[in-house]
Structures are given as structure tokens and as C-alpha cells.
């Protein structure tokens, strides 16, 4: 068996990270790759399209019911779904209580100790990425995830999050083997989106792995808790995910240490592409009425 590829999908909340990752992994499984998904998002939605489920029972919730994580067996937490993809959700505490990253740490240790990573080609971590706090950075910090793919769009906050995630990768790149595999742009149909995605990739020293076009078939599939690959395998969108999967598959060992930019540089990039205008300092703090009167 080829060496295990440990990849991770990061991205800001609501960007379509889990949808993009599950469709990409379904396409990799179509190619004959054996996949394990480890959901590291408290929403526990990283496997729903593979399992046709609302949300998979998480390791933390199952451990709480059983008494402790030591009381669990691998078959208690792992489910097998579309294309024989193995699925696990780490889970997290109730909102406002404790560190959500704790589930990530507990889960990865449990899975490793119980042989979950045997006889597979890819482990994929699906990680919340608005903030790269200690817990959510666990797959990076502990040298678990070797290739990071950031799902983003042409929206400013999605690019801001991508840059922040790159800072997290840079922090741990020298002490471990983690590298940025590239950006995946999940189209939101904003102005000059492809240009901006390519420009940000260049600034970060990486590549735009794929530009995933927006298509309503994705939502139709999601409503049925299915990937596009399963719901509409002959669709153009399914082929886009297959092309994305092929790009990821052929990208092994090609990751880079990113070169994150400052907020000012990000705003300058948006100005260069005509997305925002140069800020007139004289209008800062002025109300609409005050501006109209001036």
C-alpha cells in the first residue's frame, strides 16, 4: 500500500467546506482510494452526505454515555458510508462550555490507538477554520495533517480566514511536516472572484487547486443528504469534483510553507482589483446625514 496521505480541509464557517470536502473525498473513493473522514467541527456535519444522516454520533457524546472514551470500541464510533468511506465525528462540548478542540485531541488519540488508520490511503480532517486555536490546530500542531487545503471564496472574510489559517500553518511548518496544499475556491459569484482567488494564492506562495463553480445541484443533493457524486453522477458538477479530486491526488508532496500577508496587504489587493476603493480618511466616523450635509 502507498504511504498514508493525511490531509485536512480548513475554512471559515459557512463557506461550504464540509460539502466540498465530502464531494472531493467521494470522488477520490470512486478512484479506488480508501478513505477515512475525521470530522473536527463541533457541528458534526463532516460526514452527513456520506452517511445520509443528519449528524453522526460523536466520540465525545458516545464517551459521555459509556462513561469514558476507554469504554468505547472502534465499531461504536466508526460508520461506513458511500463508496465504503469510513466516517468518524470528534464532536465538542455544549456551546459556551469548555474547549471545542478537546474533542479533536481525544478523537485522534483514540483512533490511532484502536487501529483506525490501518489499510487506508487517505485520512481527511475536516476542521473549523475561523480561528486556529490550540484545539482546532491539533491536526497541524501534532503533525497529523500533512497537507492543508483551504476552502475559500472571493469574499473578504473568507480570504481573511484563509490568510489566518496560513499563519497557523507557518507557525508549525518548521517544527513538523505540515504544508499548504493549496486553495479551493467555492464560488459565491462575487465580483472578480477567480482573479482574487488566484491573486491570494500567489500572495501566499501557493496554488489555486480548483475553482468550484456554483450550481444548484449541490443544494439539491444536500437536501437529500447525498454528495453530488451519488445524487447526480453524470452532472457537470460531479465532473468538477472529480477534477478537483484528481488535482488533490496528484498533489502529494508538492505542498509549500505559506507566506501570509497583513490585513493592509489584503485590503490593498482588493483595491488593486477594484473591489474596494481607497479609503477617504475624512469620512471615517461620519453618519449618512453628516456626509449629506457636507
Swiss-Prot record:
Annotated cofactor note: Binds 1 [4Fe-4S] cluster per dimer.
Gene that produces this protein: nifH
Annotated function: The key enzymatic reactions in nitrogen fixation are catalyzed by the nitrogenase complex, which has 2 components: the iron protein and the molybdenum-iron protein.
Family matches, as PANTHER family: LIGHT-INDEPENDENT PROTOCHLOROPHYLLIDE REDUCTASE IRON-SULFUR ATP-BINDING PROTEIN
Residues bearing PTM ADP-ribosylarginine: 102
Positions contributing to [4Fe-4S] cluster binding: 99, 133
Disulfides per UniProt: none
The species this protein was found in: Bradyrhizobium diazoefficiens (strain JCM 10833 / BCRC 13528 / IAM 13628 / NBRC 14792 / USDA 110)
InterPro entries reported in the protein's UniProt record: NifH/chlL_CS (IPR030655), NifH/frxC (IPR000392), Nitrogenase_Fe_NifH (IPR005977), P-loop_NTPase (IPR027417)
Cofactors that this protein relies on: [4Fe-4S] cluster
Upper lineage: Bacteria, Pseudomonadati, Pseudomonadota, Alphaproteobacteria, Hyphomicrobiales
Alphabetically ordered keywords of this record: 4Fe-4S, ADP-ribosylation, ATP-binding, Iron, Iron-sulfur, Metal-binding, Nitrogen fixation, Nucleotide-binding, Oxidoreductase
EC number(s) given by UniProt: 1.18.6.1
Keyword Manganese: no
SUPFAM superfamilies tied to this protein: P-loop containing nucleoside triphosphate hydrolases
Pfam families, A to Z: Fer4_NifH (PF00142)
Protein name listed in UniProt: Nitrogenase iron protein
Residue numbers binding ATP: 11-18
